[in-house]
Amino acid sequence: MSATGLSPVRCAFVLLLALCSRPASGQDCSGQCQCAAGKRRACPAGVSLVLDGCGCCRLCAKQLGELCTERDPCDPHKGLFCDFGSPANRKIGVCTAKDGAPCVFGGTVYRSGESFQSSCKYQCTCLDGAVGCVPLCSMDVRLPSPDCPFPRRVKLPGKCCEEWVCDEPKDHTVVGPALAAYRLEDTFGPDPTMMRANCLVQTTEWSACSKTCGMGISTRVTNDNAFCRLEKQSRLCMVRPCEADLEENIKKGKKCIRTPKISKPVKFELSGCTSVKTYRAKFCGVCTDGRCCTPHRTTTLPVEFKCPDGEVMKKSMMFIKTCACHYNCPGDNDIFESLYYRKMYGDMA
């Protein structure tokens, strides 16, 4: 049959095959790398910043169900890959999840690799049966200052995220009781009453690790810098490895193992990247009587990670010196454990 005799449906099918078989725009990697100049690209919450397929530029990874090419890869941290299907010469595919267990969250079933908003405050991703969430609202901390001695977060009508407001002082000095509300623990660091070049140096405590096992995040806020400006500092933290069966190490007649001994040095992993060095790190143990064990004294050290694409990044990380076992544990149903604080006697760095 001649081309002119094709039905409209067959014409559309032939056109679709032609589009899927031709190379995607900008697919050629033979030329020199040309990346957009300026600031480092910012991706939406929960979307990874990855190296493109040509090994040139960093871009926001494609998500589940989105179109992808060899140059525009899918998000590897969510177990996604670009499924080109058939015929074999197709250059455009669809981001598909590798085989993994689905997740049940709030009565809804999500596929492995699927992202969703659990509420207006959190963006979540299902990955092989586990749900991980990142906050969509600002997690900043505002320290007391002369122009705002009593800051507090409030829920405003029509808005999802809480915002900071400044209350008027009520028979308090600027620094005393107001500052105490933000120092939930003693710290080895700058003296909060120290004046330096017209700057009242203030540093909050490190928050508890966002995860009870595996790699998490701990944060604090300080103005201990040359410009006396508030800045948020973060560090990686690992209270204990998730795969470790620590209960079997509890001695007979005891109910806790506070700081178990790790038999061999370990390498830390972060988003597919591995620490360059091995570390003989300390971790917190477990109890069989309902208590939980958390870091008591810590220090912060830089750790270098090497990624599969060759990039080397340096991150600050918490290293445990001592642990304490106690009954002040987070709730069993608290999936956002980053909101949980346990008193720690400071960072010794």
Swiss-Prot record:
Residues 1-26 form the signal peptide. Keywords: Cell adhesion, Disulfide bond, DNA synthesis, Extracellular matrix, Heparin-binding, Secreted, Signal. It is found in: Secreted, Extracellular space, Extracellular matrix; Secreted. Residues 247-349 are annotated as: Heparin-binding. One of its GO terms (cellular component) is extracellular matrix. Gene3D superfamilies: Thrombospondin type-1 (TSP1) repeat. Residues 101-167 form the VWFC domain. Residues 198-243 form the TSP type-1 domain. Its main location: secreted. Residues 256-330 form the CTCK domain. Major connective tissue mitoattractant secreted by vascular endothelial cells. Promotes proliferation and differentiation of chondrocytes. Is involved in the stimulation of osteoblast differentiation and has a critical role in osteogenesis. Mediates heparin- and divalent cation-dependent cell adhesion in many cell types including fibroblasts, myofibroblasts, endothelial and epithelial cells. Enhances fibroblast growth factor-induced DNA synthesis. Monomer. Interacts with TSKU. This is CCN family member 2. It comes from Sus scrofa. The lineage of its organism: Eukaryota, Metazoa, Chordata, Craniata, Vertebrata.
